[in-house]
């Protein structure tokens, strides 16, 4: 267990929290982390690429010339692959690039990503975001007070509409929940700002 300061939104210390070394203090497994990032990026691919094969290209129903007697090579259709404007052989077809990863590996990847952020001093724990209404200017001031870099991932315990709307128009700032935390978002961010309740929830899931 390691102690971390819990900050108020004005930057002052409100207390401390013990975070489990099993979640936030392991030696990052780079190979599993790399595999998890590739898996997530692969699942984001649309896979809608397609070309027309000889059956999909329009035309070509008539035989170009008779089979014998012309001295030329026999041809059955002008949409065969060797013809200009013909179908493509073995071209890309629509498919899903998604693949699966064992649950233990996925959890190890998340723990590795969180531990990596801790090692880089990229983890900030706050007591809570108590926004009564969406306030982008106020949210920017909070990030500035907490001395956060441009790319920040904000993690709340549950969905918080006011926080999401406050951060929506700030470039480089992304908001997610403890349940929706993923490796790609963590590694893309320079810093992680997590609420005390969200940190405990992450420990419950990954611990």
Swiss-Prot record:
A family per Pfam: Ribosomal_L4
Superkingdom as given in the UniProt entry: Bacteria
Segments of this protein annotated with the region Disordered: 50-76
GO BP field: translation
SUPFAM superfamilies xrefs: Ribosomal protein L4
Keyword rRNA-binding annotated: yes
GO MF: rRNA binding; structural constituent of ribosome
Keywords: Ribonucleoprotein, Ribosomal protein, RNA-binding, rRNA-binding
InterPro entries, sorted: Ribosomal_uL4 (IPR002136), Ribosomal_uL4-like (IPR013005), Ribosomal_uL4_dom_sf (IPR023574)
GO cellular component: ribonucleoprotein complex; ribosome
Subunit structure: Part of the 50S ribosomal subunit.
Family stated for the protein in its record: Belongs to the universal ribosomal protein uL4 family.
Function summary: One of the primary rRNA binding proteins, this protein initially binds near the 5'-end of the 23S rRNA. It is important during the early stages of 50S assembly. It makes multiple contacts with different domains of the 23S rRNA in the assembled 50S subunit and ribosome. Forms part of the polypeptide exit tunnel.
Annotated protein name in UniProt: Large ribosomal subunit protein uL4
Species: Staphylococcus aureus (strain MRSA252)
Organism lineage string: Bacteria, Bacillati, Bacillota, Bacilli, Bacillales
């Amino acid at each position: 267990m390691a102690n971390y300061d819990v900050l108020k939104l004005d930057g002052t210390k409100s207390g401390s929290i013990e975070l489990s070394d099993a979640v936030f203090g392991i030696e990052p497994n780079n190979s599993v982390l790399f595999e998890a990032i590739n898996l997530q990026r692969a699942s984001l691919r649309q896979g809608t690429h397609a070309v027309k094969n000889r059956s999909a290209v329009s035309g070509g129903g008539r035989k170009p010339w008779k089979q014998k007697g012309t001295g030329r090579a026999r041809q059955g259709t002008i949409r065969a692959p060797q013809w200009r404007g013909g179908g493509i052989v073995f071209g890309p077809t629509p498919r899903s690039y998604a693949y699966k990863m064992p649950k233990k590996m996925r959890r190890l990847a998340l723990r590795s990503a969180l531990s990596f952020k801790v090692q880089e001093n990229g983890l900030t724990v706050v007591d809570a975001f108590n926004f009564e209404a969406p306030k982008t200017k106020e949210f920017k001031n909070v990030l500035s007070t907490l001395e956060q870099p441009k790319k920040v991932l904000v993690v709340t315990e549950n969905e918080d509409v006011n926080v999401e709307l406050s951060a929506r128009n700030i470039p480089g700032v992304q908001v997610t929940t403890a349940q929706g935390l993923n490796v790609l978002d963590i590694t893309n961010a320079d810093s992680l700002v997590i609420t005390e309740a969200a940190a405990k929830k992450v420990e419950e899931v990954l611990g």
